[in-house]
């Protein structure tokens, strides 16, 4: 979940990327699983899976709750996805990849689209799913391009994430 990054990181990233209008408090950051608790838990799950002859990985990421301020939808919260979510999701992936030396298998759905699917897969993250891009007007026209870009990638062994390549992708996403 993007909340693993901490409130300060996420607020700064959103502000720096021009999403300063997105309103959220630190509530979900305090209420959700903390990074310091997530890493040991994931290690235990990987160890248990290995003992059973199985593998364990993570799917990144969920949507990110933001406050409804202009009556965009009924209720109090809506959930960020798509382009705005990508820098957060790829940053979570990078941080986890570093903590696990690239040995934690990951799948991805946080803002993948025709512009970045090949970069995500080239980092050793797969499968990758897309949704938000398809919901936009004309979104289905991107399916062929997305499929072609994904198909051009060499898929490595599951659980071999390219830590440095992913770190650069995450850093670049915070300035694009």
Predicted regions and their residues:
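Glycine-rich beta-to-alpha transition loops that act as phosphate-gripper elements at the mouths
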Residues: 64, 104-117
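Gly/Ser/Thr-rich loops at beta-strand to alpha-helix junctions
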Residues: 1, 112-115, 135-136
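A cross-family glycoside hydrolase active-site/sugar-binding cleft signature
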Residues: 1, 59-61, 107-109, 131
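Glycine/Thr-rich beta-alpha phosphate-binding loop at enzyme active sites
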Residues: 2-102, 137-152
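A structural signal for short secondary-structure junctions
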Residues: 52, 99-102, 112-113, 120-126
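Glycine-rich phosphate-binding active-site loops on the catalytic face of alpha/beta enzymes
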Residues: 119-146, 173-175
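Short glycine/threonine-rich loop-to-helix capping motif typified by GTGT followed
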Residues: 70-74, 117-123
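Extended, intrinsically disordered, low-complexity segments
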Residues: 141-176
